[in-house]
Amino acid sequence: MMGLVVVTAIAHAQQFVEDSLKVDGYMRRFDLFLPEGIKPDAPLVFYLHGYGGHIYRDNPMVETARREGFAVCIPQGLKDPKGKPSWNVGYPFQEGWKVDDVKSLSKIATYVQKRYQLSRENTFLTGMSNGGEMCYLMAYSKQKAFKAVAPIAGLTMVWMYRDLEACKPIPLFEIHGTEDRTSEWTGDLENKGGWGAYMPVPLAVGYWVAKNRCTKEETERVESLNKENGHYVIKHRFTDSATGCDVWLYEVVGGKHSTHTEDLHTGDEIWSFFKMYVR
């Protein structure tokens, strides 16, 4: 009963809560946004920062959560061997790093669901850049915490594509700029950038189109919200999935390495995808 009182008070105040959970000897910190009037068993969305980043409260999901009534968990990555906060996705310079972020994020999800009375069934994962790579790794992994993933400027590392076999279909939505020079749209199979070899974005997404057995592609072109940057967005939606798991790819033509909030309502678009799987 005491937990219910605390959560109700927090929700009414519409504020960020700072919390932490010890996993494998590491204290894993996170902030949690609970919008005003949030209901028990509300959906939960995780947002993961990029390489070298920190808990980012001003991320694209928070304003959408404020309007739509879901919670946003924003975890902090641990420092890798280079001393940079990150998620362990198997970059070459992370070799030997024993942190298991698939396990850690799954444990945090279970803790947050129970502690703050949020939905165990309707928990989703999104993230930017290194956080996007973590979304792909989670999709490939044998995990039950996250129902769908939405990487932003994320990549599938060649080692994932080569060595892992997804144990089950999962809905996936990628947003990526064609002029991204950090996470190249065309991939980097020779590891020229030093992040490790990674797949071209269309091929990486195509794996999930095949895995999810999507049989139809719908394509729509929309202009950027910023009428002066010359960008436009091609929305590829792969539907009619025999597994019930659609795949979306938003190709931001001219877009660079960003969350693309100048080009589209990123948080709203991601939530519109996740919301299809809320039960």
Predicted regions and their residues:
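Bacterial Sec-dependent N-terminal signal peptides
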Residues: 1-15
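A domain-start/cap signature at the N-terminus of enzymes
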Residues: 11-44, 53, 64-67, 93, ...
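Short substrate-entry loop that stabilizes the transition state in hydrolases
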Residues: 38-83, 146, 158-159, 182-184, ...
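Cap/lid segment of the alpha/beta-hydrolase catalytic domain
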Residues: 77-100
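Conserved acidic catalytic loop of the alpha/beta-hydrolase fold
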Residues: 103-121
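Short, proline-enriched alpha-helix->beta-strand connector loops that line the catalytic pocket
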Residues: 167-172, 243-247
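Short beta-strand/loop motif that positions the catalytic acidic residue
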Residues: 174-176
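Accessory cap/linker subdomain of secreted extracellular hydrolases
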Residues: 178-219
